[in-house]
């Protein structure tokens, strides 16, 4: 199994349930792992592998669509990646909100969603 990683990507986006979050936006950190079986393909040609630039562009486009919950954002990214690459066996995505509007919090909050496919 081969896994492609995109780690600690940072986006400004307008996700959140509070009006200030959707209006002003926030910084988000995204990490993504995509695993697939590589044993039947040649790994010396970009058309035979999952291109991390394509994955980045999918994440970037989905992060630009405002949604109230990070769970919904993660699910939409996973659905799009799976639609583009049917041979994927596992996807895991972590989305962290870097400046959560919670009084007194100093740190990141977020979610991780992982899905396995047959």
At which residue positions do the language-model features occur?
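N-terminal, polar/charged subdomain of small-to-medium soluble alpha/beta proteins
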Residues: 1-118
């Amino acid at each position: 199994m081969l896994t492609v990683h995109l780690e600690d990507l940072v986006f400004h986006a307008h996700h959140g349930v509070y009006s200030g979050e959707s209006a002003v936006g926030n910084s988000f950190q995204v990490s993504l792992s995509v695993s697939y079986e590589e044993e039947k393909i040649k790994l010396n040609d970009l058309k035979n592998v999952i291109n991390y630039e394509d994955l980045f562009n999918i994440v970037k486009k989905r992060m630009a669509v405002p949604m109230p919950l990070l769970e919904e954002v993660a699910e939409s990214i996973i659905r799009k990646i799976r639609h583009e690459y049917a041979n994927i066996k596992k996807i895991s995505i972590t989305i962290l909100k870097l400046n959560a509007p919670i009084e007194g919090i100093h740190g990141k909050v977020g979610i991780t969603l992982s899905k396995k496919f047959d």
